[in-house]
């Protein structure tokens, strides 16, 4: 039976206005829209009155529901029948954890009530198309129609393909029907294999073969034999990449054989809880570094949010599934798309060349895709710290004559670093009889054929197959699985994981054969033991679907009870679906139909399939000299600053959490004005050291339209000039990931790919001492479609994205582009040696040209000398600022440095040649460094010692004020106010934020950037930052116990425990499942802290599901009430813990006036480094800090204080319960965005009880308790940041 329960309003006023504006633009007479959530409860038994009231209360969250009955025509948008949304699985979990076992499943839809004039059927179709994502949702016209969401179907049997009866044609037909993308020789191979076996193949076997042997999984082109211009080539592409490892194996611990590569890290204190006692402590050991970079291009073109989200999720799983289990740590992301054509902000170079119907626009991708990638990282709890963004779409005269080149098939890059224990780097041995386990969520009928689909050019496959190949994301489930993996590796020698892989392309059909085959075993499996939420799925759908957030593991049979215990505690679902066999054979039994859908020798599936030979021709690009007529420097500056590749990226940065883990030493945002211009990302290796890890990206794809090899060399060079800004030491410490994107088969591109791989793998990297131990290829970067009567193609440039990773010696010595105005000198190190080439530059692009000669690595020895020289200067502390030259050239390098320093520049380019345009806009490799004027001679001496004397040019100095002036030989070349340039640079991000978020907030942020008087972040402390008020109490030897409380989806508990640990507490890991099962109680604890993250993925309101699992469970409710009423206890709730505790008002004495915390005014997750003031309040944690103003990490989507009315707000204020407020950079309490990131009235962001014993706050003090983890800080701070004081206050209060 199904119950229907109304929910809260689903759209804010500005979202409704945006929808109405879209309808009006489409000439649809829609006058009014009202939208509200509707909940559907599938029940296995009727609810009594109390249970019904409980369910209603559970589903009451968010803004208050309108009292009137909605008017207009109903359009009900729900998940597609046959799928289960992530919302559903998490909401159902909450219901069960609250004791409502009669609920089979909860699901949610949005009921739109449309008031409109007379619309035709076709116009109604237009309306419904605007309201739902056809990839994931459907539209009903009556609430009762939602019954279809819970319809169950009977299982369907396996289907046989009549090869023996119909011969080869049966395989050809199956290839088309199932979208297998099999090549002719593979069809021959299968015909031969099954004829020898004397039986017909089943559809599931063919599908499994296609996935396991797709280009996506087997990398056939990179392993192919090559004939170029009739000449046999000596090496495959992959062998040339491996040459870098053979030449420089130094510091690499694992390459080419696992889900990620591993290099040596530093010996540090890894901080985690003991399995038996739950007590957190440091464990001194090597924290080796793993690295991986993936792409998820095809799904992102079809459906950007889930495409980018599952791209990030899959890469995170790769990291976790390295060795015998590892810990993902920090991420990077990148996008290449065609021109944005922002409505009302179209640029002169942005022509519309059309696109296929089934893929979305570049604007859609950049609106939804980054949000999907960021949301996954945020909810999983991984900071996203680095990235790139390129737009390109043009008709150019390249290698193949005049043709369309651009990114209709986008690049969506997802990568990152993690850490792994030394004894877990290599996978273990799978013994015969080992249990084969799937860890993670259930099988769902989604993401079928992703491997094969992504191996085809967009437009070649059936639209329905395209849709089927997109997956859904549930990061909170992946977090639970990762917690299990963490518990396993933390057991050291007792780790129950023998072998682990992630489930990605091809689902279990690829992952399980890979697992057993890599372990030298076969496997026998039972289909019906696979967790599945859809009983009507066929064997093919169960075995081959790409449901996300799953891992496959081999666990020793005697370790299964331990593994079961860990999974139950973390509430991570798992299933034992088979066991390892001696015989190298794969069998899958189906007990429902009592048959064998799969019965194959492993070597048929993974054996010697036909090897590819690429017989290709070289084409040379002609190029045309840059036509300069009509180009002025003033116009060029404005155009280049508007090019998205160059322009400010704030709209891509602040949506991503950049502080979670408490180990982020350098994020994108630089300096007191928080400008997104960092050269590289840096994390600390642990919470107790200054060792670290660095990441940087290099990418120069448009250059490949003129010179394939130069483009690849520049990508390596740019990655190197970016990562050089931190203290690494020997260049051999740097390891690269190479991600290759090409349109294989397009004239000239294959030979160009070979040329580029050779340039990097055989020549440049070995010469520099660089290794490429990991990478990925995507070989179908072309889109075909019909535009009227014309057949069109959009082919991407050959695109190499290099991600550089390195161990860092001391994270405190990372140099940023932030200029200082003390007596200084700016020096350009020009590795272009005066070539100043303008081919394929940003300048050429904004004037719709390609040019002829591009930049290149001009001298490999000088590039190596450059890196070594910068490292020497970093170590000697000679650099005040550093920024590499890249897209936009020297002009943009200097401008970005001025933006970061909020200062002026007097630049002198006299020594850079007479061609001023080329001097300012060439994109040759190099960097601008700022040094003290007194150090100039010593710095130039170091550069000369490294062979760079002829590359160094004096280019002026930074000055106070707002003028950005470039001169040469006393003549003014360009002059403008820095503020004007800053506003131009910001206009793209402003327009994107206006489209995507609350336009009022976007306008306020843009306005703030034009205020030259803004003093930036600053600090005023009312206490001595270096005084340890806890020291006398720590000296007694007593360590009070603090319960570090987490619920599924919480992700900030480790850094919280570390902060309390440093203040003299014993921090104990307490999961809500420990309390609900009675494994742990709160009676032994002196303090309790509820941590940040996304409990239940913020389903049923942020923190509300967590609170209700306490309130609706009598024993646990009593436990909390007793704790809060016990004298001499302290409690802190941060972010998600703050939201949760605000819903426990009925249990917490003196909290009756506390507000609720609801959706930010911007309607967006906000990650900021915000200034707050400590106000006079009873809070015991903030004693002695009143009046202090200091920055703090903020990361939340629902942090806006909501009060009942003005009287409620006045009472909260008059009782003095407000503990922290947002202030602007002038020190004034503010409600203006982004200084107040959520729009809370009176800037309120923390409140306390009347006794001061319980304090809740939205910002994250635990992420910035170390100075080094602050995005910006005064130079005189030591190890401890000012927020360490609240943890020491807690220790002091407990005596």
UniProtKB/Swiss-Prot annotation:
Top enzyme class: ligase
Name the Gene3D superfamilies on file: 3.40.50.880, Phosphoribosylformylglycinamidine synthase, linker domain, PurM-like C-terminal domain, PurM-like, N-terminal domain
Keywords linked to the UniProt accession:
ATP-binding, Cytoplasm, Glutamine amidotransferase, Ligase, Magnesium, Metal-binding, Nucleotide-binding, Purine biosynthesis
Which residues constitute the catalytic centre? Answer: 1135, 1260, 1262
The Glutamine amidotransferase type-1 domain covers 1042-1295
Top-rank taxon, per record: Bacteria
Q: Which reactions is this enzyme annotated as catalysing?
A: N(2)-formyl-N(1)-(5-phospho-beta-D-ribosyl)glycinamide + L-glutamine + ATP + H2O = 2-formamido-N(1)-(5-O-phospho-beta-D-ribosyl)acetamidine + L-glutamate + ADP + phosphate + H(+)
Region annotated Disordered, chain positions: 305-327
Main localization of the protein? Answer: cytoplasm
Report the NCBIfam families cross-referenced here: FGAM_synt (TIGR01735), PRK05297.1 (NF003672)
Can you say what this protein is called?
A: Phosphoribosylformylglycinamidine synthase
Organism whose genome encodes this protein: Shigella sonnei (strain Ss046)
Tell me the lineage of the source organism.
Bacteria, Pseudomonadati, Pseudomonadota, Gammaproteobacteria, Enterobacterales
């Amino acid at each position: 039976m199904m119950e229907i329960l109304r929910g809260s309003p689903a759209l804010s006023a500005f979202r409704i206005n945006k929808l109405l504006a879209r309808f009006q633009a489409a000439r649809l007479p829609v006058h009014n829209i009202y939208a509200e959530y509707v909940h559907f409860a599938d029940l296995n038994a009727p609810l009594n009155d109390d249970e019904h009231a409980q369910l209603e209360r559970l589903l009451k969250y968010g803004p208050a529901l309108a009292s009137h009955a909605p008017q207009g025509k109903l359009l009900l948008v729900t998940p597609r029948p046959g799928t289960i949304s992530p919302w559903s699985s998490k909401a159902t979990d909450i219901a069960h954890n609250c004791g409502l076992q009669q609920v089979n499943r909860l699901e949610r839809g949005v009921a739109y009530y449309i008031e409109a004039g007379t619309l035709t059927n076709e116009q109604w179709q237009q309306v419904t198309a605007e309201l739902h994502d056809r990839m994931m949702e459907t539209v009903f016209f009556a609430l009762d129609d939602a019954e279809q969401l819970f319809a169950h179907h009977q299982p369907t049997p396996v289907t046989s393909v009549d090869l023996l009866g119909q011969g080869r044609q049966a395989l050809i037909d199956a290839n088309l029907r199932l979208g297998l993308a099999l090549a002719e020789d593979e069809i021959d191979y299968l015909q031969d294999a099954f004829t020898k076996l004397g039986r017909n193949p089943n559809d599931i076997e063919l599908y499994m073969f296609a996935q396991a042997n797709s280009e996506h999984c087997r990398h056939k082109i990179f392993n192919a034999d090559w004939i170029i211009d009739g000449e046999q080539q000596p090496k495959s592409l992959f062998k040339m990449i491996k040459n870098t490892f053979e030449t420089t194996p130094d510091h690499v611990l694992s390459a080419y054989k696992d889900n990620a590569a591993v290099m040596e890290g530093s010996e540090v204190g890894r901080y985690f809880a003991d399995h038996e006692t739950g007590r957190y402590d440091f464990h001194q050991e090597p924290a080796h570094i793993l690295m991986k970079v993936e792409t998820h291009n095809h799904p992102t073109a079809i459906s950007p949010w889930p495409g980018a989200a599952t791209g990030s999720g899959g890469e995170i799983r790769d990291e976790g599934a390295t060795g015998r289990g590892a810990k993902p740590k920090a991420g990077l992301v990148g996008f290449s798309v065609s021109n944005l054509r922002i409505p009302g902000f179209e640029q002169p170079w942005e022509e519309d060349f059309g696109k296929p119907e089934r893929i979305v626009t570049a604007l859609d991708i950049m609106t939804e895709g980054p949000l999907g990638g960021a949301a996954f990282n945020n909810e999983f709890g991984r900071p996203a710290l680095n990235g790139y963004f390129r737009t390109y779409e043009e008709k150019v005269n390249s290698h193949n004559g005049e043709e369309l080149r651009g990114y209709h098939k986008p690049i969506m890059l997802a990568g990152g670093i993690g850490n792994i224990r030394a004894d877990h780097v290599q996978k273990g041995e799978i013994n015969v009889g080992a249990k084969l386990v799937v860890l993670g969520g259930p099988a769902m009928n989604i993401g079928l054929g992703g491997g094969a689909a992504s191996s085809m050019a967009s437009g070649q496959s059936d639209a329905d197959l395209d849709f089927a190949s997109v997956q859904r994301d549930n990061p909170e489930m992946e977090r639970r699985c990762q917690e299990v993996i963490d518990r396993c590796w933390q057991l050291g020698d007792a780790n129950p994981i023998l072998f682990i892989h992630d489930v990605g392309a091809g689902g279990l059909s690829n992952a399980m054969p890979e697992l057993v085959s890599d372990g030298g075993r076969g496997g026998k499996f039972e289909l019906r033991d696979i967790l599945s939420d859809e009983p009507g799925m066929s064997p093919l759908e169960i075995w081959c679907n790409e449901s996300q957030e799953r891992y496959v593991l081999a666990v020793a049979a005697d370790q299964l009870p331990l593994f079961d215990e860990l999974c139950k505690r973390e509430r991570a679902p798992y299933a034992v679906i088979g066991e390892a066999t001696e015989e190298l054979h794969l069998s899958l039994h189906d007990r429902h139909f009592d048959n064998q859908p799969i019965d194959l020798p492993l070597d048929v599936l993974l054996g010697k399939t036909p090897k590819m030979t690429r017989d290709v021709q070289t084409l040379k690009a002609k190029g045309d000299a840059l036509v300069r007529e009509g180009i002025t420097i003033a116009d060029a500056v404005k155009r280049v600053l508007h090019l998205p590749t160059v322009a400010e990226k704030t709209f891509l940065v602040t949506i991503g959490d950049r502080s979670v883990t408490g180990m982020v030493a350098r994020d994108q945002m630089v300096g007191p004005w928080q400008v997104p211009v960092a050269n590289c990302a840096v994390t600390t290796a642990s919470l107790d050291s200054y060792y670290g890890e660095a990441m940087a990206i290099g990418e120069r794809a448009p250059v490949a339209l003129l010179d394939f090899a130069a483009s690849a060399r520049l990508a390596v060079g740019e990655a190197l000039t970016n990562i050089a800004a931190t203290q690494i030491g020997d260049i051999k410490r740097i390891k690269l990931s190479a991600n290759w994107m090409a349109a294989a088969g397009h004239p000239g591109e294959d030979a160009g790919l070979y040329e580029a791989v050779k340039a990097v793998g055989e020549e440049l990297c070995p010469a520099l001492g660089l290794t490429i131990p990991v990478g990925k290829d995507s070989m179908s970067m072309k889109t075909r479609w019909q535009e009227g009567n014309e057949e069109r193609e959009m082919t991407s440039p050959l695109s190499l994205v290099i991600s550089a990773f390195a161990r860092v010696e001391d994270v405190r010595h990372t140099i940023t582009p932030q200029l200082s105005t003390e007596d200084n000198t700016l020096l350009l190190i020009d590795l272009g040696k005066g070539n100043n080439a303008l081919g394929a530059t940003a300048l050429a692009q904004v004037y719709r040209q390609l040019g002829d000669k591009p930049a290149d690595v001009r001298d490999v020895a000088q590039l190596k000398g450059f890196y070594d020289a910068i490292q020497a200067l970093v170590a000697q502390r000679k650099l005040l600022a550093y920024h590499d030259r890249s897209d936009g050239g020297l002009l943009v390098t200097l401008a970005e440095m001025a933006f970061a320093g909020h200062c002026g520049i007097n630049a002198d380019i006299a020594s850079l040649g007479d061609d001023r345009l080329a001097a300012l806009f060439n994109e040759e490799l190099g960097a601008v460094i700022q040094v003290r004027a007194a150090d100039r001679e010593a710095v130039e001496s170091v550069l000369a010692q490294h062979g760079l004397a002829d590359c160094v040019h004096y280019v002026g100095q930074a000055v106070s004020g707002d003028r950005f002036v470039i001169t040469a030989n006393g003549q003014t070349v360009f002059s403008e106010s820095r503020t004007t340039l800053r506003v131009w640079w910001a206009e793209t991000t402003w327009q994107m934020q206006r489209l995507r978020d609350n336009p009022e907030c976007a306008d306020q942020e843009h306005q703030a950037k034009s205020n030259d008087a803004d003093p930036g972040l600053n600090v005023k402390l009312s206490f001595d930052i270096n005084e340890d008020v806890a020291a006398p109490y720590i000296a007694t030897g007593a360590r009070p116990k603090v319960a570090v409380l987490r619920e599924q989806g919480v992700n900030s508990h480790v850094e919280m425990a570390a902060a309390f640990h440093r203040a003299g507490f014993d921090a104990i890991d307490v999961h809500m499942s420990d309390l609900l099962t009675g494994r742990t109680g709160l009676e032994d604890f002196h303090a309790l802290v509820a941590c940040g993250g996304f409990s239940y993925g913020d389903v049923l309101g942020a923190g509300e599901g967590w609170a209700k699992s306490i309130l609706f469970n009598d024993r646990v409710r009593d436990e909390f009430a007793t704790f809060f009423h016990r004298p001499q206890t302290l409690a802190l709730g941060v972010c998600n813990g703050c939201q949760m505790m605000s819903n426990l008002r009925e249990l917490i004495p003196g909290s009756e006036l506390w507000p609720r915390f609801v959706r930010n005014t911007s309607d967006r997750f906000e990650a900021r480094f915000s200034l707050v003031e400590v106000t006079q309040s009873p809070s015991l944690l903030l004693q002695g800090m009143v009046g202090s103003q200091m920055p703090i990490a903020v990361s939340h989507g629902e942090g806006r204080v909501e009060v009942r009315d003005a009287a409620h707000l006045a009472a909260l204020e008059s009782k003095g319960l407000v503990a922290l407020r947002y202030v602007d950079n002038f020190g004034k309490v503010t409600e203006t965005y982004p200084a107040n990131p959520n729009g809370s009235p009176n800037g309120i962001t923390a409140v306390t009880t009347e006794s001061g014993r319980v304090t809740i706050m939205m910002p994250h003090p635990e992420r910035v308790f170390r100075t080094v983890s602050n995005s910006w800080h005064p130079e005189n701070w030591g190890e401890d940041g000012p927020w360490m004081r609240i943890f020491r206050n807690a220790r002091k209060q407990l005596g």
